[in-house]
């Protein structure tokens, strides 16, 4: 799990269990509210057999996030997706 701080948001990479393994995700939460975090699937929704594999993919994706918009959308580096 990795954490990245932005101007108004915080993002955390993680793996979440799914029926047949794990998915890589990035969760984003606005700092000044109690709103629920938004979860974004990364790695094109690929399923991994091991949680550690999904976490590596999620951490790699998080390094390519430049900023989070005011609406909580991920803003990626150029050519990242």
PLM regions with names:
Residues 2-25:
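Short N-terminal "domain-start" leader segments
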Residues 24-27, 36:
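RNase H-like nuclease fold core
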């Amino acid at each position: 799990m990795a954490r990245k701080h932005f101007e108004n948001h915080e993002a955390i990479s993680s793996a979440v269990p799914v029926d047949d393994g794990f998915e890589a995700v990035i969760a984003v939460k606005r700092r000044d509210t109690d709103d629920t975090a938004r979860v974004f699937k990364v790695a094109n929704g690929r399923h991994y057999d091991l949680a550690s594999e999904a976490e590596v993919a999620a951490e790699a994706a998080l390094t390519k996030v430049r900023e989070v918009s005011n609406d909580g959308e991920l803003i990626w580096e150029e050519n990242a997706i």
